[in-house]
Swiss-Prot record:
One of its GO terms (cellular component) is extracellular region. Disulfide bonds: none annotated. Sequence repeats lie at residues 38-46, 56-64, 76-78, 79-81, 82-84. This is Seroin. Residues 145-167 are annotated as: Disordered. Produced by both the posterior (PSG) and middle (MSG) sections of silk glands. Its main location: secreted. Residues 1-17 form the signal peptide.
Amino acid sequence: MATKILIFLSFVALSSAGFVWVDDDNNSFPKLRQLYVPPLPQPPPLPNIPGLPQPPPLPQPPPLFGFDFSPILPIPPIPPIPPILPTPPFINIPAPEDIKNIKPKPGQFFNGISVKSRSGYALDKDGNRVKTGGTAVLINDNGEVNETIVGDNPPKFEESRKESSSN
């Protein structure tokens, strides 16, 4: 056992024989700088009372060390990225009355369709829930207007103009 300890100590002595442990203040590692730590504020002094000692000042925090990145070049600002998709143009959607009243001139063509539907539940005379509603379809095929209504309580296209003007 003593032989193992002696061999171990000789390896330690040989490996550190070339190093001199000198305390020096020069910055052997220039990127490591001492960071500023502001001092702690001291409490106000207590009134002088005979027989009562004053408390000692608060201890100050130790200095912090960190890397100094000042020699590194600053990062340039990133230029703004243009939008990938273009802004779509404003589309004017005609009201059902507009579709109904369009009459194409000679050499022009127009096809328009408007669909409005509603569904709901109501109570019949016996108190049972009954599904109500319907659909109204307006088609203008080159000036020829066809209006189809399906269901027991379909919406009317005139109602759509009132709803859109009240919103």
